From Swiss-Prot:
The gene is obg. Its cofactor is Mg(2+). Monomer. Keywords: Cytoplasm, GTP-binding, Hydrolase, Magnesium, Metal-binding, Nucleotide-binding. This is GTPase Obg. Its EC number is 3.6.5.-. Belongs to the TRAFAC class OBG-HflX-like GTPase superfamily. OBG GTPase family. PANTHER family: DEVELOPMENTALLY REGULATED GTP-BINDING PROTEIN-RELATED, MITOCHONDRIAL RIBOSOME-ASSOCIATED GTPASE 2. It is found in: Cytoplasm.
Length: 389
């Protein structure tokens, strides 16, 4: 299936049902009191993470999603049915962003997690709600409020512990093939990898981590060169980055300049991402003699001013790859667990209890009627509809 990691959709929550103006009519009770019921609440729209999905391709072809409207109230104090909520299944790792305001609504990082993205409208009130000692025959009702309408941008961010970055043809895909059972395409030309790939690494029995391989970066990627930086977002949730450097580029480019270009593009894209733990990994060491290799590694590290961890591997021959995988496993195990608790401040607030209270108070204060409700004639009055904004 085609990998799609971005989609823009429109979600519409259901409108609330309107209240009803009705009066009790039974045998021997020709002029009963009010019995108009409330409307039903409109259905809301939720996103739910599902581990059985791994792409957003369905949302490319189906962009409009609407929840059910609440039913109107009816006589005999019958409340209208609430609209059915609409639940949209998305892959684990999906981020929801308001397309108009760029506000991040939330991240779905665990299977079954739900996120409210459009709140259903509140139900209207029937005339029974306006009954009081001074208003025996109320002809007021309120309409249901409109449901929330939102344009959403869905972004799929891969969930991985380790992220690979580097120039095209640095050997990232070869490395992920060497340490996992992933089989990304490998060839001797740039940009062989066109979409991100995931691999599960098992250095020890019962212990594993996930590694992500993204298409290579080149200088100017932040300005759209090559495949741009659209795939860098997949590294945002990684806990450590491996900067793969081709120790002996076939095109004769300077590894130092290439490494600096990658770091520069990373900082342009996101200083937060650039500040993540990062290890230097020199690949294709089988192309150099041992003494020459060490001299070249020392020179590159010195010119870069690098003070972090440095490793040398040959992904093609799988020299040093298992040792590096073990180091990564131990490092990830030493990190504190990630905090995925939902921020309560990010949840949608809705004032259910006092939403219509202002209308009820104003009607009861302004409306004074000393007559009993058994002595009125329906035809002498008009129904008053109270509109809510």
């Amino acid at each position: 299936m085609k990998f799609v990691d971005e989609a823009v959709i429109r979600v519409e929550a259901g409108d609330g049902g309107s209240g009803c103006v009705s009066f009790r009519r039974e045998k021997y009770v020709p002029d009963g009191g009010p019995d108009g019921g409330d409307g039903g609440d409109g259905g809301s729209v939720f996103l739910q993470a599902d581990e059985n999905f791994n792409t957003l391709i369905e949302f490319r072809f189906e962009r409009f999603h609407m929840a059910e409207r609440g039913e109107n109230g009816r006589g005999r104090d019958c409340t209208g049915h609430s609209g059915k909520d609409l639940i949209l299944k998305v892959p684990v790792g999906t981020r929801a962003v308001d397309h108009d305001t760029e506000e991040v609504l939330g991240d779905l990082t665990t299977h079954g997690q739900k996120l409210l993205v459009a709140k259903g409208g509140f139900h209207g009130l029937g005339n029974t709600r306006f009954k009081s000692s001074t208003n025996r025959a109320p002809r007021q009702k309120t309409l249901g409020t409109p449901g929330e309408v939102r344009s959403l941008k869905l972004e799929l961010l891969l969930l991985a512990d380790v992220g690979l970055l580097g120039m095209p043809n640095a050997g990232k895909s070869t490395f992920i093939r060497a340490v996992s059972r992933a089989t990304p395409k490998v060839a001797d030309y740039p940009f062989t990898t066109l979409v991100p790939n995931l691999g599960v690494v098992n250095p020890r029995p019962g212990q594993s981590f996930v590694i992500a391989d993204i298409p290579g970066l080149i200088e100017g990627a932040a300005d759209g060169a090559g495949l741009g930086i659209r795939f860098l977002k997949h590294l945002e949730r990684c806990r450590i980055l491996l900067h793969i450097i081709d120790i002996e580029p076939i095109d004769g480019t300077d590894p130092v300049e290439s490494a600096r270009a990658i770091v520069g593009e990373l900082e342009k894209y996101s200083p937060k991402l650039a500040s993540k733990p990062r290890w230097l990994v020199f690949n294709k060491t089988d192309l150099l003699l041992e003494e020459e290799l060490q001299q070249k590694v020392d020179r590159i590290v010195k010119e870069m001013g690098w003070e972090g961890d440095v490793y040398t591997i040959s992904a093609y021959n799988r020299d040093g790859t298992n040792e590096l995988a073990l180091k990564l496993l131990d490092y990830i195990a030493s990190l504190p667990p990630e905090d995925n608790e939902i921020d309560p401040d990010s949840e949608v607030e809705f004032k259910w209890d006092n939403y219509h209270q202002a209308n009820l108070d104003s009607v009861n204060e302004d409306y004074v009627d000393e007559d009993d409700d058994d002595d009125f004639d329906d035809d002498d009055y008009d129904v008053e509809v109270i509109y809510q904004r």
